[in-house]
Design a protein with these regions (language model features):
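Flexible coil/loop and intrinsically disordered linker positions at secondary-structure junctions
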Residues: 1-131
């Protein structure tokens, strides 16, 4: 296979270091994952270069965050496929990688009934937009 050079960016993330730092505070405050994440872990997540995987506590809350980031063009609209294709996140119960279908269902649910903790995400998204 041909060696591809340059930086791959499947999420097409426009997030800067200070914005990722803010998002790190957000996901930790919202207890999004089963572990506390560092700025480096979140940076690696958005670069699809995680040394391991994250395990989600609440898939709907994750979907809500990613949906918001996508709405404001911080990441691509196809974020669900990026998570599935790169096997970045495991389901809490079965410990299997989240699929696009799981994320699509969670996104639909989050649009109808805001998930517990959504106000934490809204607060940080507002801060992101202020710069």
């Amino acid at each position: 296979p041909a060696k591809i050079v340059g930086k791959s960016n499947p999420f097409k993330s426009t997030l800067k270091a200070n914005e990722i730092k803010l998002l790190t505070e957000c996901v930790n405050e919202a207890n999004m994952f089963t572990t506390t994440v560092s700025t480096k872990i979140l940076t690696d997540f958005f670069n699809c270069k995680l040394d391991g995987v994250l395990k989600v506590n609440n898939t709907r809350l994750l979907a809500y965050l990613m949906m918001q980031l996508s709405c404001y063009n911080y990441i691509v609209y196809e974020w669900q496929s990026v998570i599935e294709n790169n096997k970045l996140i495991l389901k809490k119960i079965k410990g299997e990688p989240l699929t696009r279908t799981d994320l699509s269902s969670a996104t639909d649910q989050a649009k109808n009934i805001y998930p517990k903790g959504y106000e934490i995400i809204d607060k940080y998204i507002k801060q992101l937009q202020k710069g």
